């Protein structure tokens, strides 16, 4: 029997690795991305490339404009994307309830197609300030999924997977390389231009670059300004 899984796919390094991991675990993968009002479209173009390259059975992009709410440097142009590293607490790049919103869409799609597994790229090491990237959040969402769905209450349980949650960026990169992930297809930058070139100075760029250095893997990232 075919095991189907929904994989949240942003187009970045982490979610690309998670898609490859779900494939390697024997799942027929369905990739889900969201056009939520992020600052650039290159992230979604990257998601399309990654989904195709890694052989997702289907890739859906959902429109849900979170810019109408604001509250994050990623959805509100009045807020600056930080370039000076983590300052403690919850970063301003946290998008209110984003993982909960996206997992709920994934849950609905999974139940509709008979899938019982959800994968997403939560990581508690590099982004420890995000409340929806913690192990307890993953466990709580799995409980919710099984309380809030027909399948769940009938005993056909859902499982929420966050396979990179305790991994460093270097460990994630090395795992992805072994699985054949082409990181040149991905975009992680918070301020990428329309061609997908990274700014090189935002927190996401700094963490990504340091990850490649620590892993001893050549960085395929295209930067707006040569470094």
UniProtKB/Swiss-Prot annotation:
It catalyses: 7-carboxy-7-deazaguanine + NH4(+) + ATP = 7-cyano-7-deazaguanine + ADP + phosphate + H2O + H(+). Binds 1 zinc ion per subunit. It holds the Pfam family QueC. Keywords: ATP-binding, Ligase, Metal-binding, Nucleotide-binding, Queuosine biosynthesis, Zinc. ATP binds at residues 9-19. Belongs to the QueC family. This is 7-cyano-7-deazaguanine synthase. It comes from Cupriavidus metallidurans (strain ATCC 43123 / DSM 2839 / NBRC 102507 / CH34) (Ralstonia metallidurans).
